[in-house]
Amino acid sequence: MTITINNYNNDKKNLILGLTGSVATIKAKLLVEQLIQHFNLIVIPTETSLKFLSDQDFEFISSKCKIYKDKDEWENVDLLKRSALHIDLRNWANSILISPCSANTLGKISNGLCDNLLTSLIRAWDYKNKSMILAPAMNTMMWENPFTFKHIETLKSISPNVFIIDPIEKKLFCGDIGMGAMEQVPKIVDFTINNLK
């Protein structure tokens, strides 16, 4: 399988938006609304992220851009053409934005694990020529955990094309007040525009 971009405006750059299992995924519709003004967009939600998307939001997103889920990786394997979806996605994209990036996904990708479509794409990413932008979102204690610091430092050490959009302090979904909320959507979009490879 090779990804076609016939439905896209080819003067725009190609961006993949990864959604992960954080409650901040409820902002995905707003993020997509703003990103599609600037980029050709493909969305890759993890299975856990889908629990935070309403049916209406999923329908809206799928009406604006292509969505690839974990099952698509295996349904589209073409051994004769020696094609894999995560490789086709990497070849298509100029950049990837993972927003929100959960503690779980952050830990996986910083340790090279690749057990779903999104993390397989990250494992095969071209860090020399393409940017990867992460917008973490998690509980304050998870954000302040020493493992989180190590994971972020590991990713930053891979390439100057890896960017972290630090979370902000506010009242979190769990009721705690502290650092860990995903940055505001307009700031994430602006950062992505300015740091796209």
Curated annotation (Swiss-Prot):
Q: What protein family is recorded? A: Belongs to the HFCD (homooligomeric flavin containing Cys decarboxylase) superfamily.
Q: Name one GO biological process term.
A: coenzyme A biosynthetic process
List cofactor names only. FMN
The answer to whether keyword Flavoprotein applies is yes
Family matches, as InterPro entries: Flavin_trans-like, Flavoprotein
This protein's pathway: Cofactor biosynthesis; coenzyme A biosynthesis; CoA from (R)-pantothenate: step 3/5
Q: Does the keyword Transport apply?
A: no
Residues where substrate binds = 139
Query: What organism does this protein naturally occur in?
Result: Dictyostelium discoideum
Q: Name one Pfam family in it.
A: Flavoprotein
What is the stated purpose of this protein?
A: Necessary for the biosynthesis of coenzyme A. Catalyzes the decarboxylation of 4-phosphopantothenoylcysteine to form 4'-phosphopantotheine.
Q: EC?
A: 4.1.1.36
Q: Per UniProt, which keywords does this protein have?
A: Coenzyme A biosynthesis, Decarboxylase, Flavoprotein, FMN, Lyase
Q: Which leading EC class covers this enzyme?
A: lyase
Protein name, as recorded = Putative phosphopantothenoylcysteine decarboxylase
Annotated cofactor note: Binds 1 FMN per subunit.
Ligand binding (FMN): 52, 102-105
A GO molecular-function term, please?
A: phosphopantothenoylcysteine decarboxylase activity
